[in-house]
Structure formats: C-alpha cells, structure tokens
C-alpha cells in the first residue's frame, strides 16, 4: 500500500480509510485493538486515538465507550465531506464521480435558483451584474460560477442548500477550473448567465426550471467532450 501523507496523523487516517475502501477492514468488522493497530501503522496511540475520533465524526467508524471500534458502511453513514476522500481513493472512477456530482448539483440548483429569483430577485440581479466585467479565463469563470451558486443558494429561502454546496466546493472548484479552460464552455456559461440575468430583472422565477434544464443538458454534453482529457491530478486535493 503506497500512501502519500504529510505527517503521522495524515498517514494513519489514509491507511485506515484505504483499508476500509479495499475491504481489509470491511463494513461491520471490528478494528484491531488500539495497541495492535498503532504498531501496525507505526504511529503513537495518542495520534491513533485522534485519528479514530475524526474518522468516527466523518462516519467511517462507530466508537462506543467500553466496546471495540466497528467499521461502518460509509455509504450509509457519511456525508458530502468525504467526496474528496473518495476521489483520492478511486482515481479510476473519478470521471463517473464527477458525472454524478454535476448531475446532483444541476438537479439541486434548479430548486435554489428558482427560490432566489422568487424571494430575492434583487440579490440575483446584483450578483449577475458581475458577468459584464468577467474576465475570459478559466479561473475567473470557475470562481464566478461558484459565487453565483453560493449566493443564490443562500438567497433561496433555505440556507441548507449552502451546506450542500459547501460539500461540493473543493472538488467542484478543481473540476470547474478544468471545464472552463474550454472557450466553448465559457461561452455556453456566459449565454446562460445572460438569460438568467434577464429572468432576474423581470422577477420571472417561473421560467427558471426550463432554463436550468436546457443549460444542464448542454453543459452535460460539453462535459462529455472534455472529461476524457481531464488530468488525473484533479482527483487529488493538493
């Protein structure tokens, strides 16, 4: 098992998570005793305890006082905060993970975009006005796209959408910077922003879902053209 880590705690965390992912520690199984596991990994027991507590908070493990530590089925117990970890664990499956991420974000964003234009159209107008000074670079488009989603999610009347977006942030930002290296992708997005701006100015929230569906389909087709050339390094949070 080859693990790149910045310190003992990082190494221990990656070792345990990789072992769970590879079914060395399968769901429902009991982790080795603390002393045995610390010797196996090569870290102090104090460091190991801190790592186990962190992994339990993320849903990988179940820790109960006086009982051995049990491995969870992380698909059932973890949240969006492990997306980065899954991307790092399974680089071969990263393109599929991104497909699923983009599909989920498209479906959810249709709800909070509509809500923002319904309840806070002036906020939507203000943030969309930034497109007229938007630099034609991948970095600028990726940053603005996240800003737009974050602002409209917060203005939708349901701030929980912001928490969902926060779970996507690191992974989506890296993918976005790659996606927007395409001038065609930037033009497609700019046209979408302009149409959305017109709806916001007219306080027309009813037509938002149709616009989102169209852009979702078109950007999805664009992504399929780009994803095969995506650098493998995007899967890693450097």
Swiss-Prot record:
<dbReference type="Pfam" id="PF07840">
    <property type="entry name" value="FadR_C"/>
</dbReference>
<feature type="DNA-binding region" description="H-T-H motif">
    <location>
        <begin position="34"/>
        <end position="53"/>
    </location>
</feature>
<dbReference type="GO" id="GO:0000062">
    <property type="term" value="F:fatty-acyl-CoA binding"/>
</dbReference>
<keyword id="KW-0678">Repressor</keyword>
<dbReference type="Pfam" id="PF00392">
    <property type="entry name" value="GntR"/>
</dbReference>
<comment type="function">
    <text>Multifunctional regulator of fatty acid metabolism.</text>
</comment>
<comment type="subunit">
    <text>Homodimer.</text>
</comment>
<keyword id="KW-0963">Cytoplasm</keyword>
<protein>
    <recommendedName>
        <fullName>Fatty acid metabolism regulator protein</fullName>
    </recommendedName>
</protein>
<dbReference type="InterPro" id="IPR036388">
    <property type="entry name" value="WH-like_DNA-bd_sf"/>
</dbReference>
<dbReference type="GO" id="GO:0019217">
    <property type="term" value="P:regulation of fatty acid metabolic process"/>
</dbReference>
<keyword id="KW-0805">Transcription regulation</keyword>
<dbReference type="InterPro" id="IPR008920">
    <property type="entry name" value="TF_FadR/GntR_C"/>
</dbReference>
<keyword id="KW-0443">Lipid metabolism</keyword>
<keyword id="KW-0804">Transcription</keyword>
<dbReference type="GO" id="GO:0005737">
    <property type="term" value="C:cytoplasm"/>
</dbReference>
<keyword id="KW-0276">Fatty acid metabolism</keyword>
<keyword id="KW-0238">DNA-binding</keyword>
<feature type="domain" description="HTH gntR-type">
    <location>
        <begin position="6"/>
        <end position="74"/>
    </location>
</feature>
<dbReference type="GO" id="GO:0003700">
    <property type="term" value="F:DNA-binding transcription factor activity"/>
</dbReference>
<dbReference type="GO" id="GO:0006631">
    <property type="term" value="P:fatty acid metabolic process"/>
</dbReference>
<dbReference type="InterPro" id="IPR028374">
    <property type="entry name" value="FadR_C"/>
</dbReference>
<dbReference type="GO" id="GO:0003677">
    <property type="term" value="F:DNA binding"/>
</dbReference>
<dbReference type="InterPro" id="IPR036390">
    <property type="entry name" value="WH_DNA-bd_sf"/>
</dbReference>
<keyword id="KW-0010">Activator</keyword>
<dbReference type="InterPro" id="IPR014178">
    <property type="entry name" value="FA-response_TF_FadR"/>
</dbReference>
<dbReference type="InterPro" id="IPR000524">
    <property type="entry name" value="Tscrpt_reg_HTH_GntR"/>
</dbReference>
């Amino acid at each position: 098992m080859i693990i790149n880590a910045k310190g003992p705690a990082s190494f221990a965390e990656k070792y345990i998570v990789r072992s769970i992912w590879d079914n060395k520690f399968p769901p429902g199984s009991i982790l080795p005793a603390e002393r045995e596991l610390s010797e196996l990994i090569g870290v102090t027991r104090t460091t190991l305890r801190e790592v186990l507590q962190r992994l339990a908070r993320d849903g990988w493990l179940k820790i109960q006082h006086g009982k051995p530590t049990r491995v969870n089925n992380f698909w059932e117990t973890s949240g969006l905060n492990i997306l980065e970890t899954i991307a790092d664990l399974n680089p071969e499956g990263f393109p599929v993970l991104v497909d699923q991420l983009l599909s989920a974000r498209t479906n959810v964003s249709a709800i909070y975009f509509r809500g923002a234009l319904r309840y806070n159209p002036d906020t939507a107008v203000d943030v969309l006005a930034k497109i007229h000074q938007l630099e034609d670079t991948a970095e600028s488009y990726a940053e603005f796209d996240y800003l737009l989603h974050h602002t409209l999610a917060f203005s939708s009347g349901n701030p929980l959408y912001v928490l969902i977006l926060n779970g996507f942030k690191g992974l989506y930002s890296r993918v976005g910077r790659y996606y927007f290296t395409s001038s065609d992708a930037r033009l497609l997005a700019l046209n979408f922003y302009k149409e959305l701006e017109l709806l916001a100015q007219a306080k027309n929230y009813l037509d938002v879902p149709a616009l989102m569906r169209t852009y979702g389909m078109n950007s999805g087709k664009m992504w399929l053209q780009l994803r095969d050339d995506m650098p493998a390094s995007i899967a890693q949070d450097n």
